[in-house]
Amino acid sequence: MAKEQGTKPIAQNKKARHDYAIEDKYEAGLVLTGTEVKSLREGRASLAESFITIDRRGEMWLEGANIPEYLNGTWNNHAPKRKRKLLLHAAQIDKLARQTQAKGFTIIPLSLYFKDGRVKVEIALARGKKEFDKRQSLREEQDKREALRAMRYANKQVR
């Protein structure tokens, strides 16, 4: 079988971009079992309530991510919401650990995808938005949409 090329998205954390202001992004590998990979190949995953922690030994963990059991799995199927280890360089983990000590910063998963046949997680160093920030960003997006709509309408009238 030929080796897979390119990226294939599995799951997005859409709420994260709404609730957090993203400062910096990283790509991390993920330690998985065989049935987890098979379940991900079927496109079954959710990052909705997931978060990332750094333990005392300097290891990063993805917690709360839901990868449902593989339907054709046997007795050795995985637990759907277990902790999963993230693979990053030690220097990157140290940098993220220092930055999360700063006020208001946290590490969140943004997306889960296959890259050249391996499962990767896009994680971000983020700061939580206040309620008025969320409303303002929604208003800005709506204004952009209305401006594009008006420009399309004006261009259509010219023809």
Curated annotation (Swiss-Prot):
Keyword RNA-binding: yes
Source domain of life: Bacteria
Alphabetized InterPro entries for the sequence: SmpB, SsrA-bd_prot, SsrA-bd_prot_CS
Keyword terms: Cytoplasm, RNA-binding
Subcellular location: Cytoplasm
GO cellular component: cytosol
Single annotated GO MF: RNA binding
PROSITE patterns: SSRP
Family: Belongs to the SmpB family.
Role description: Required for rescue of stalled ribosomes mediated by trans-translation. Binds to transfer-messenger RNA (tmRNA), required for stable association of tmRNA with ribosomes. tmRNA and SmpB together mimic tRNA shape, replacing the anticodon stem-loop with SmpB. tmRNA is encoded by the ssrA gene; the 2 termini fold to resemble tRNA(Ala) and it encodes a 'tag peptide', a short internal open reading frame. During trans-translation Ala-aminoacylated tmRNA acts like a tRNA, entering the A-site of stalled ribosomes, displacing the stalled mRNA.
Protein name per the record: SsrA-binding protein
